[in-house]
């Protein structure tokens, strides 16, 4: 059996960066195509960010700002944090969890990796 610490051949700093980037892209674009493992890993963090957006307090804004990457959206006037609190979170006020959906796709041609689309419901 492989050494558990070397199972994915990546360090935790790399995983944290990838997860933050994918969650930010998911919240801004609405869906992301990635590997199945990455989709499963970012699902919980994306749902936590939407829950923080629903609370809409100063503390929740600071917690979300600590996690999300601050990149500009299409209209150039709002960053990802403002987009989460002003556009994404109000859509889910009546919903108690289950904000994302993972749909499996065919395996990737180059390395036969399991692919999936994670999208906001």
Swiss-Prot record:
Chain ranges passing through the membrane: none
Pfam families for the chain: Ribosomal_L17
Listed GO CC annotations: cytosolic large ribosomal subunit
Gene3D superfamilies: Ribosomal protein L17 (3.90.1030.10)
Alphabetized GO MF terms: structural constituent of ribosome
Keywords linked to the UniProt accession: Ribonucleoprotein, Ribosomal protein
BP GO annotations: translation
InterPro entries: Ribosomal_bL17, Ribosomal_bL17_sf
Claim: Transmembrane helix is one of the keywords in the record: no
Subunit structure: Part of the 50S ribosomal subunit. Contacts protein L32.
NCBIfam families in the cross-refs: L17 (TIGR00059)
Annotated PANTHER family: LARGE RIBOSOMAL SUBUNIT PROTEIN BL17M, RIBOSOMAL PROTEIN L17
Protein family: Belongs to the bacterial ribosomal protein bL17 family.
Name of this chain's protein: Large ribosomal subunit protein bL17
The species this protein was found in: Metamycoplasma hominis (strain ATCC 23114 / DSM 25592 / NBRC 14850 / NCTC 10111 / PG21) (Mycoplasma hominis)
GN (gene name): rplQ
């Amino acid at each position: 059996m492989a050494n558990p610490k070397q199972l994915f051949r990546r360090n935790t700093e790399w995983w944290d960066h990838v997860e933050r980037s994918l969650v930010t892209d998911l919240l801004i674009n609405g869906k992301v195509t990635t590997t199945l493992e990455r989709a499963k890993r970012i699902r919980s963090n994306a749902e936590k960010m939407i829950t923080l957006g629903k609370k809409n307090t100063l503390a929740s804004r600071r917690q979300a700002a600590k996690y999300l990457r601050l990149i500009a959206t299409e209209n150039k006037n709002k960053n990802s944090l403002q987009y989460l609190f002003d556009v994404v979170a109000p859509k889910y006020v009546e919903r108690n969890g289950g904000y994302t959906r993972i749909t499996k796709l065919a395996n990737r041609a180059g390395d036969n990796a399991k692919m999936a689309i994670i999208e906001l419901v």
